[in-house]
Amino acid sequence: FGKVHAPDVIKCIEAGKYVLCEKPLATTAEDCLRIMEAEQKTGKKLVTVGFMRRFDAAYNEMKAVLDKGEHGQALLVHNRHRNPSVPESYTSRMAIDDTAIHEIDTMRWLLGEEIVEVRIDRPKSTTRRFDHLIDPVVVVMKTASGVLIDDEVNVNLQYAYSIECELVLETAAVRLGDQEKIHIRDIHGDRNAMCQSHIDRFQAAFNNEFQSWINAVGRDEHTGSTSWDGYAATCVVDAAVESLEDDGAVKAVSMIAKPDFYA
């Protein structure tokens, strides 16, 4: 559905309406630039992109530890994005522009800097995939300051929807906690239920995102991510897809200078 976002978002902007657009903002950097151009003409930020992980409590705690600075700078971030399965319509490109795009935006937000280069590594493929699909893949990214990020995208793992993240600092490592609220310990062992979908895992984040946007609109204010964030994520996606199609070659992320409007 990403291909239909740009025309509708631009119509909302032209009507002077706030809009919460599901990711991606658009499927091409050119369409993102068109959106930003239309928005800047209004002189007002109107577009929020639906990157809901910015509203997840655990990710926010992780960011607070980093921003506090007690444990030094970020050095590495390890991510795992695992799905139990995907439909046959899911493509290898979607592993990047529909799945990894969540980590792409979250890493930009968490670290407070842009991703400047990316490559795609291809491990041994799972036998659980459809024949047309490359799965799993590992998206390897580097930020402007040199933080190295890896993201395992593994969408046919069968057992659960599992989102994992570990932030490695100079004197500490910060990891997202377990997905469920309780563990059961009995004669059969120590266990907890596993999420089976993104709604299971991020229901509270979705609700927080929507309520934050509704409240902001009521105050005639912008909240959350901007069109620039949508554009930046799409630029990283474009470079990653280039790498996927070029045997994993390292690709530079090409972006315009950030307009003062989005500073």
Question: Model-derived features: where do they sit?
Answer:
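Rossmann-like NAD(P)H-binding beta-loop-alpha module
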Residues: 57-79
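Hydrophobic residues in well-ordered beta-strands that form the structural core
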Residues: 21, 27, 47-49, 78, ...
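Rossmann-like dinucleotide-binding domain that binds NAD(P)(H)
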Residues: 86-160, 228
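C-terminal helix-rich "cap/oligomerization" subdomain common to oxidoreductases
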Residues: 33, 215-263
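A short helix->loop->beta-strand "cap" motif at the edges of active sites that frequently abuts
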Residues: 15-17, 42-46, 147-148
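Beta-loop-alpha module in the N-terminal Rossmann-like domain of NAD(P)-dependent dehydrogenases
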Residues: 1-38
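Rossmann-fold dehydrogenase core element
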Residues: 33-52, 72-78
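NAD(P)-dinucleotide binding in Rossmann-like oxidoreductases
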Residues: 122, 129-132, 144-209, 226
